[in-house]
């Protein structure tokens, strides 16, 4: 098999469209096989689009989100696999309430690791992407996604582990997504000001020390994917329960984004092949 294969592991449907989506669309368009693995069904996600906040949607939210995910995958040109766990929800309050019984974040780690190992050994990706140890933000399912992904990356290559889950496969590189960068937000906010408009990012920037962008300091790899930003946004809009089309995400014109920040960012977390940093290609150094 000489084709390149990329696996993007995400916690919920819609995460694949808000984190690294233009990169996955680019590689799929260039002929790589790309698979998105979604660990939960997003059953406990809030409805964030007022137009979809309807009783008939609430009553069948799991089915609706599956349909949304199928549309987004088609738009991005990727394959898709559900790992089959139940959304934990985002606990709120002080003190935080306990997580619901049976949710993904409370399932013993070995269960999702074994399922993901099986998918890895079947798809045989050269590269995987997932979240950092903080989950990108501290949602319990995102943190668990990190733990599961890293454990499965290691276990899939070990013939002693999960021998009934297929022939061992060593993924060559593992990356963390890093899409929430202060400098990008600052550039876009300044562009609004230059055009006599009030940008939507002031509320974020005022509490964010410009000298302490911990995410930017971790970036090793910047993938040029500006021509796929339209696909990214179309895929995100496909998740109509989760995305308000009038929300902040869509305020900055695509043309500004393409000119000011034409890349998506990643952190190389683990590699089994020689690497030279910084990079501009997730497949750099990979042996097909």
Curated annotation (Swiss-Prot):
InterPro entries: GlcNAc_PI_deacetylase-related, LmbE-like_dom_sf, Mca. Its EC number is 3.5.1.115. The keyword Hydrolase applies. It comes from the Bacteria. Disruption phenotype: Loss of amidase activity on MSmB, no production of the mercapturic acid product AcCys-mB. Limited degradation of MS-RifSV, a rifamycin S MSH conjugate. Increased sensitivity to streptomycin, slight increase in sensitivity to rifamycin but no other antibiotics tested. Increased sensitivity to iodoacetamide, N-ethylmalemide (NEM) and redox cycling (oxidant) agents known to conjugate with MSH such as menadione and plumbagin, but not other oxidants. Optimum pH is 7-9. GO terms for biological process: mycothiol metabolic process; mycothiol-dependent detoxification. Partially inhibited by MSH when MSmB (a bimane derivative of MSH) is used as substrate. Keywords: Hydrolase, Metal-binding, Zinc. Zn(2+) binds at residues 12, 15, 142. Pfam families: PIG-L. Transmembrane segments: none annotated. Binds 1 zinc ion per subunit. Belongs to the MshB deacetylase family. Mca subfamily. This is Mycothiol S-conjugate amidase.
């Amino acid at each position: 098999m000489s084709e390149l294969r990329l696996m993007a592991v995400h916690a919920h449907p819609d995460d694949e469209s808000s984190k690294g989506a233009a990169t996955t669309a680019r590689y799929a368009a260039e002929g790589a096989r790309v698979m998105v693995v979604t660990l939960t069904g997003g059953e406990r996600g809030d409805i964030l689009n007022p137009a979809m906040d309807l009783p008939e949607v609430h009553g069948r939210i799991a089915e609706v989100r599956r349909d949304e995910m199928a549309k987004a995958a088609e738009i991005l040109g990727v394959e898709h696999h559900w790992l089959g766990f139940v959304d934990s929800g985002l606990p709120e309050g002080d003190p935080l309430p306990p997580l619901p019984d049976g949710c993904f974040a409370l399932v013993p780690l070995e269960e999702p690791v074994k399922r993901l190992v099986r998918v890895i050994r079947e798809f045989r990706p050269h590269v995987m992407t997932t979240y950092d140890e903080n989950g990108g933000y501290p949602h319990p399912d995102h943190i668990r996604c990190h733990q599961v992904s890293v454990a499965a990356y290691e276990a899939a290559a070990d013939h002693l582990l999960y021998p009934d889950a297929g022939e061992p496969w060593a993924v060559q590189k593992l990356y963390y997504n890093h899409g929430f960068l202060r400098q990008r937000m600052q550039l876009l906010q300044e562009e609004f000001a230059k055009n006599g408009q009030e940008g939507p990012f002031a509320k974020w920037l005022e509490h964010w020390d410009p000298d302490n962008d911990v995410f930017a300091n971790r970036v090793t790899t910047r993938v040029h994917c500006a021509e796929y930003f339209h696909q990214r946004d179309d895929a995100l809009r496909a998740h109509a329960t989760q995305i308000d089309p009038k929300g902040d995400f869509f305020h900055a014109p695509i043309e500004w984004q393409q000119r000011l920040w034409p890349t998506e960012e990643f952190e190389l977390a683990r590699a089994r092949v020689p690497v030279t940093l910084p990079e501009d290609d997730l497949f750099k150094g990979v042996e097909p």
